Amino acid sequence: MSIDIEKYPTLALVETPEDLRLLPKESLPKLCDELRLYLLNSVSRSSGHFASGLGAIELTVALHYVYKTPFDNLIWDVGHQAYPHKILTGRRDRIDTIRQKNGLHPFPWRDESEYDKLCVGHSSTSISAGLGMAVAAEQENLGRKTVCVIGDGAITAGMAFEAMNHAGDINPDMLVVLNDNEMSISENVGALNNHLAQLLSGKLYTTLREGGKKVFSGIPPIKELLKKTEEHIKGMVVPGTMFEELGFNYIGPVDGHDVIALVQTLTNMRDLKGPQLLHIMTKKGRGYAPAEQDPISWHAVPKFDPKTGTLPKSPNARPTFSKIFGDWLCEEAATDEKLMAITPAMREGSGMVRFSKEYPAQYFDVAIAEQHAVTFAAGLAIGGYKPIVAIYSTFLQRAYDQVIHDVAIQKLPVLFAIDRGGIVGADGQTHQGAFDLSFLRCIPNMIIMAPSDENECRQMLHTGYHYQEGPVAVRYPRGSGVGAPLQPLSELPIGKGIIRRQGKSIAILNFGTLLPEALDVAEKLDATVADMRFIKPLDKELILSLAKQHDILVTLEENAIMGGAGSGVNELLMQERCLVPVLNLGLPDLFVPQGGQEEIRADLGLDATGIEKSIKAYQAHSLR
């Protein structure tokens, strides 16, 4: 059921930013109110990222009002806050399809709209890409402007500072908007600071500023004195010294919910030369009390009733793999004070809330800094402690060199608890955990495990934690297990799988949580099923035995086929000169789009029906 746009009379006038720029400035607060309500009513029906968008309403309206999008470059970091941007850029009537199969993409996406200048999803990429676009715009010389919007979390990543350091060196015309949505508004925000921001960004101040620099440019001591004086005056009322040192002209902080003041400040800043940084303070979840009070829980939401102000509880009573991990952490830490758990800003998602409260001295949230997280763990291991890096599969990609250079080469005992392995679902291409088995399998000294259920996950985490001869990775999926009873912790034999079902002719070598589908298919085809458990080292003895006893081997994994566990089986068989037909089933050579997890598995032939169909087709071909 679509939303009746007639209930939003000002928003109804705005299909695109061109329409927005025709509105009188005085109508913008009304537009913001309607846009906020529209976002509430749409996301509550569709699910999606919520609190961030509520906090970015005024900024979104002001940016599209002042800048000539899509001619000007507007880049959103991560993209959680970009739902209002999508609503204002011709996608209002489809916003209720966001994150669904064949619906709007959850993040800004270049193939979806000319207003989306950069595909995003991972953090802290906006300033680097924006800097490249700004340099290209200068070469183009058509007056195109570039704006990057980045949050206070994303700007903590090293990549953002690398980009700002470079921008300060080459001095392009660009604007970085720091959307600071901490829980409380800064003391500096208010009438005085809003007025100061407009003054410091105004023509008179900037003319005097640049003119003075030109006059005294030949007298280095005086030029330096002017620079220090300016920084001192600004430093008395604004916290921008760090950004000034990087070469940015800092303006702010200002109230990010005063759309009229934002429009004035952005208008003043639009034609300033060199790198500019506008620091705005916003409230995550603004305008909806439950989200304001608990922005973490309301960051990404299922469908809910806006009138009740409560989020529905999951109907699945089985624990998630993330919770299994978090509970195991607490159980292990209870008897080992050398356990150190690390997360790059994913405490809630990784199931570490309980651990962080019960063992605060052994818990480290290093912010959005995956590279640092891994090398920090390496240092802890060298110091005699037992580090565990809890990280999503898709984010481990950002720390690949550190895994190799700082951990594996030195054979350091670091346990990688890799969450969201395989198909993640609604967040789409940027968040599927499709590649970890492939990019980890080729690293020497690395042990890799993939559990088939939640009990096996616990045992593998325990095994990896107590293995002290090198790094270990345990990868597990998003979502709940199958309800397997949890057994007391014990170490598994390294590199050994087990037979789950004995059959004939066909042997399915399963890696990970597709085991129920494998067993379902095996019942129909009377196939053998092996729960391989280890991707590296492979159970050579078991694989060769299955190859000798069966006509066809089928490898099954929720990872890219190229370079994955099945590729490892192929390599082993070739090395042993064992000639047997092998069917590799897994993720194809494409970036897996958004949709429900079960929808995607069905589309890719990784549900029981698809697996059976693929095996029968391969079997028929082999018999010709």
UniProtKB/Swiss-Prot annotation:
Pathway of action: Metabolic intermediate biosynthesis; 1-deoxy-D-xylulose 5-phosphate biosynthesis; 1-deoxy-D-xylulose 5-phosphate from D-glyceraldehyde 3-phosphate and pyruvate: step 1/1
Cofactor binding note of this UniProt entry: Binds 1 Mg(2+) ion per subunit.
Cofactor(s), by name: Mg(2+); thiamine diphosphate
KW Transferase (keyword) present: yes
MF terms in GO: 1-deoxy-D-xylulose-5-phosphate synthase activity; magnesium ion binding; thiamine pyrophosphate binding
Function text: Catalyzes the acyloin condensation reaction between C atoms 2 and 3 of pyruvate and glyceraldehyde 3-phosphate to yield 1-deoxy-D-xylulose-5-phosphate (DXP).
Family: Belongs to the transketolase family. DXPS subfamily.
Protein name: 1-deoxy-D-xylulose-5-phosphate synthase
Organism: Proteus mirabilis (strain HI4320)
Gene this protein is translated from: dxs
